[in-house]
Amino acid sequence: KRGVTLREDDRFPCNAGNCACLPLDSYSYTCLSPTSSTANCESDECVSEDDW
Protein backbone atom coordinates (compact mmCIF):
# COMPACT_ATOMS: atom_id res chain seq x y z
CA LYS A 1 0.00 0.00 0.00
CA ARG A 2 2.82 2.38 0.87
CA GLY A 3 6.36 2.80 -0.39
CA VAL A 4 9.29 0.53 0.30
CA THR A 5 9.61 -0.29 3.97
CA LEU A 6 11.42 -2.80 6.14
CA ARG A 7 8.16 -4.09 7.53
CA GLU A 8 7.30 -7.64 6.56
CA ASP A 9 3.57 -7.26 6.96
CA ASP A 10 0.95 -4.61 6.40
CA ARG A 11 -0.24 -4.17 9.95
CA PHE A 12 -0.28 -0.67 11.31
CA PRO A 13 3.11 -0.26 13.04
CA CYS A 14 2.00 2.15 15.77
CA ASN A 15 -0.19 2.15 18.84
CA ALA A 16 -3.78 3.21 18.49
CA GLY A 17 -4.04 6.97 18.53
CA ASN A 18 -0.59 7.51 17.07
CA CYS A 19 0.31 7.89 13.42
CA ALA A 20 3.07 6.47 11.25
CA CYS A 21 5.67 8.81 9.79
CA LEU A 22 8.19 7.77 7.15
CA PRO A 23 11.22 9.99 7.82
CA LEU A 24 12.88 11.51 4.78
CA ASP A 25 16.18 9.84 5.70
CA SER A 26 14.84 6.41 6.60
CA TYR A 27 12.95 3.43 5.19
CA SER A 28 11.38 2.43 8.47
CA TYR A 29 8.38 4.10 9.98
CA THR A 30 8.45 6.00 13.23
CA CYS A 31 5.41 6.65 15.36
CA LEU A 32 4.29 10.14 16.23
CA SER A 33 1.49 11.59 18.24
CA PRO A 34 -1.10 13.33 16.05
CA THR A 35 0.05 16.68 17.41
CA SER A 36 3.66 16.19 16.34
CA SER A 37 5.20 18.07 13.44
CA THR A 38 5.32 16.12 10.19
CA ALA A 39 7.97 18.40 8.64
CA ASN A 40 10.48 15.54 8.49
CA CYS A 41 8.01 12.99 7.14
CA GLU A 42 7.65 11.81 3.56
CA SER A 43 5.03 13.97 1.80
CA ASP A 44 4.77 15.90 5.07
CA GLU A 45 2.22 13.41 6.34
CA CYS A 46 1.70 11.13 9.28
CA VAL A 47 -0.57 8.21 8.46
CA SER A 48 -3.29 7.39 10.95
CA GLU A 49 -4.44 3.83 11.57
CA ASP A 50 -7.69 4.62 9.75
CA ASP A 51 -5.74 5.67 6.65
CA TRP A 52 -3.21 2.86 6.76
From Swiss-Prot:
Keyword Secreted carried by entry: yes
Name of the molecule in the record: Conotoxin Cal9.2d
Tissue note: Expressed by the venom duct.
Subcellular location: Secreted
Disulfide bond residue pairs: C14-C31, C19-C41, C21-C46
Keywords: Disulfide bond, Ion channel impairing toxin, Neurotoxin, Secreted, Toxin
Cited function: Probable neurotoxin with unknown target. Possibly targets ion channels.
